[in-house]
Amino acid sequence: MTQITGTLINYYFHCKTQCWLHANRINLEDNSEDVRIGKILHELADQKGKKTEISIDNVKIDKITKDYLVEVKKSDSDPEAVKWQVLLYLYKLKQKGVLKKGKIEFIEKKKQSKKVHYVELDEVNEKELLEVLAKITELIDLPKPPEAKFENHCKKCAYYEYCFI
């Protein structure tokens, strides 16, 4: 069984086809401008001596502070997907006996300040998360990907040509 990563849960909320393709090792993201920008943001933080990425099990957490697990994103284009990604990370930490709150920092390209969202793994969110994880497992175990549904964000996706051309 595939271990569900932060990327997979993010893709599940963003696009079921993308989630299935990524989980089944059809990776076209090396050609994605957005993926490159995200990697550069992490590299810049590393160069400034702020290397804070932490690996726990099969997930990579951007940063942990005294009170928060922090996830950094370049834009707030899909905050719901990021929320569930952070809830997964909080759940993984809880399984290790570490209780934190989630903090999502969106670094907007053309704005002076960053947007910050907060999330907590309460009983309701944890129950929903476990249901989502079961649904993701069902999805990625399908023999073929679900049919792609065109959305506005598809044009910027690394899988656009695979799905629509």
Residue ranges, per PLM feature:
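Broad gene-expression machinery/nucleic-acid interaction feature
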Residues: K60, K101, C154
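Short helix-capping/linker segments at secondary-structure and domain boundaries
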Residues: W20-L28, L93-K100, I165
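Short, flexible, glycine/charge-rich loop motifs used to bind or transfer phosphoryl groups or to couple energy/partner
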Residues: E53, K60, K92, K144-E147
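Short, charged low-complexity intrinsically disordered segments located at boundaries
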Residues: K39-E43, K50-T52, Y118-V124, A158-I165
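Cysteine-cluster motifs in flexible loop/terminal segments that predominantly coordinate metals
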Residues: C15-C19, P143-I165
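Nucleic-acid nuclease catalytic cores
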Residues: I56, I64-I140, E161
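Metal-dependent nuclease catalytic cores that hydrolyze phosphodiester bonds in DNA/RNA
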Residues: M1-L69, K73-E80, W84-L87
